Amino acid sequence: MVVNQPNSQSGKQGRKIVTTRPAFPKAAVAVIATAAIVIAACQVEDSTVTSAAAVINPTRVVITEKVAGSDFPVHLAYVETIDGLYTPIGIRKPEGDGPFPIVLFASGNGGEGMAWVRDATQNRSWTQEQFVKAGYAVVWTRYRAEVELAYANYGQLIEDTRQGRQLLNRGPLEYEDMISIIEFVKTLPYVDPARVGYMGMSHGGEMAFKITSEYDGLRAAIASEPANHEFLALTPDDTAHINPESGLRDIESMLMRETEKVRGRIDLDLAQQRISTIKTPILVQGRNGDELQGIFRVGYDLLQEAGKDAEWKSYEHDVHGFVYVARNAAGVYDPDEVQMQGVNDSIAFFDRYMKP
């Protein structure tokens, strides 16, 4: 989880990475302890629940858990990705058979597996609850961890065969896992495959740009506080540095608030080329005062300049990722007015493209 707090030396807003995973609320622990295991081609292929004695399809096993304080359970599953490895997701949906529009949610960098999905479902799902109440199926997604500069250095994924087996020019990246998830949810019987949306925050917001630049299977997307430095081919300034222990870039303290500064440090021709292939309507959400607000805005500006279907909204809030409302220290959801407005705006955006 990433939050903003004042830097004690400079007084500026800087990002603090909270590395400890929030504990499940007591109520959530109780329901997880009694989670129903659903054997599960049935759960994914159709709406019929079979008994444990039924034939098990190992590629379609789903575990259903209650969500604390909610009437909508989560169906935990694994999706096969390009190279045959599996990535975890958590699906929730309204009552009934659908077909429903569906929105996939992504937050920040990848990794941490099913534990992350379960924790986010129990502790960061107020926003998703509002979507389900508005008639959407929702998915918390996980994907591979970011690979430093792989998107910039190795180009698009190319698939071939060698000795009858799959051959790739590079390993799949996190946004390609997301495309696999998108294609998977389109096969679910309660999902309308023509009404699939995506909402990504921070690195997940950049993934919205990467996905739609190469893939035209989304009806609409939201890029919330998109950390687009790689997509825009931005060269960091001296506010970023190299981590001496890993040799990798540390950009957590990078300051890119001004659009003029950002434009002067990106590869404009390359960024415009990547933007040119986007066909998906995109809402870009900024956050006033964020140290990367210039990056957020330039992503939108380039969409607008290229004549794309794009919208911009910016909000006054202290927390990076404010649109994904988390439980407070007391274990309850208590969204403020700005968070509620951001979520309402997000639902309204998807409604325009994904509701009849």
Residue ranges and their predicted role:
Residues 191-202:
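Alpha/beta-hydrolase fold nucleophile elbow
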Residues 205-216:
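Short glycine-enriched nucleophile-adjacent loop
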Residues 71, 218-274:
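Mobile cap/lid helix-loop segments that gate and shape the active-site cleft of serine hydrolases
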Residues 309-356:
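C-terminal catalytic histidine-bearing segment of alpha/beta-hydrolase fold enzymes
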Residues 278, 284-286:
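Short beta-strand/loop motif that positions the catalytic acidic residue
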Residues 156-189:
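Alpha/beta-hydrolase active-site loop
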Residues 98-100, 108-148, 292-293:
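Short substrate-entry loop that stabilizes the transition state in hydrolases
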Residues 55-97:
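N-terminal cap/lid segment of alpha/beta-hydrolase-fold proteins
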